[in-house]
């Protein structure tokens, strides 16, 4: 067994994945949905990826022994043709992937909780409704919770640099105490603040809004490293079916990557996702910071090919290249 194994699997060309990657269609839960070629291919990909990772690491036993499994997607201003925009932006976890992950997990533990507090300004309940996460919860008989509405418990982090205290919503207290199994299912995408945003940054959506805003500045890399002292995913599955390049949390452009990345070491898994986007993790301050803290234990053993897509990086300048392209005289 090698706990730092990372599995990468892709869907072959020819199966269109650019349909319903932000929001589930109306026929979700019916035969017409589950018989679609893309849905069958995604389900097979999720099952293959997790089956191989289980064979390599044996994480299933911890799922079986846990009180429940808490699965956190990454929902960021889900606007699925909702009258605000014409386009679909690949910023949120693909609900087709989430559905397959829940189905796989329930083979080993029936008690599953989908938990999220999506980025402003979209209320999480609205994000659940638009994306279809509420229907996944209903169809699969899971719990569903908006974390911003939950009571919190205060923890002190003596080793932290900037997050000396943290408020954890009660659905994640079992994760902190080692009773529950925590799965992070982020989107493969770039980010304006941290260059990339993947599995362990997804924990930012756990803490209350006021704490997210605190040190959400040039010290954000230290803040995210601090979070690993208390919230470390037991399993990370990165949704890279349709990646997002650009200035998250602003709208991003789709990248047809057609892959999933999964691992039980959150830092090693995120480093593989970073390389897939075409970035050297050693040149990204966030990964350097977590390395200084001792959370990085060397490169993972990768099962599968690691393609490189050269995502367009986020542009943090006030007036970026796109602006100057359209307004060259300013």
Question: Where on the chain are the PLM-derived regions?
Answer:
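N-terminal and secondary-structure boundary signal
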Residues: 1-330
